């Protein structure tokens, strides 16, 4: 069963993504910002198949988190999400470390498909 770490400062988005992804039997852990997520990744020694993170967050944004996670836990696949065009543009420079960027708001089907694609891509690398 794949383990997914979901990071978003908006509780409603975190819970929507968690419920959607749990439908496929994945184990879910959540964090409210990048610093908390990095702490969880470290304490769990990067034992996650996927990091699904919002880009715009307080304390540590998703891009800083993605860079740190890719450096410290290169086996963890990274999937970004944002509702802002400028943040999506910032993320375009991360194609070497991030599988894709999901545009918010998204449907349950959208996030399930994006996660399935990212997990499949992670297994093939």
Regions found by a protein language model. Give the residues of each.
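Charged docking surfaces used in two-component/phosphorelay signaling
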Residues: 15-23
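Acidic, metal-coordinating helix/loop segments flanking the phosphotransfer/catalytic sites
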Residues: 30-50
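Acidic catalytic/metal-coordinating carboxylates
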Residues: 33-36, 61-65
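Active-site T/S-Asp motif of two-component receiver
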Residues: 53-54
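C-terminal output helix
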Residues: 106-119, 123
């Amino acid at each position: 069963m794949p383990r997914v770490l979901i990071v978003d400062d908006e509780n409603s988005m975190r819970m929507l993504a968690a419920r959607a992804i749990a439908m496929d039997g994945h184990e879910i852990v959540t964090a409210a910002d990048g610093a908390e997520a990095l702490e969880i990744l470290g304490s769990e020694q990067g034992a996650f198949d996927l990091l699904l993170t919002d880009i715009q967050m307080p304390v540590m944004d998703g891009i800083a988190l993605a860079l740190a996670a890719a450096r410290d836990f290169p086996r963890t696949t990274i999937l970004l999400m944002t509702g802002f065009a400028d943040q999506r543009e910032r993320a375009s420079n991360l194609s070497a470390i991030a599988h894709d960027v999901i545009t918010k708001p998204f449907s349950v089907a959208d996030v399930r498909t994006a996660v399935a694609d990212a997990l499949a891509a992670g297994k093939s690398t």
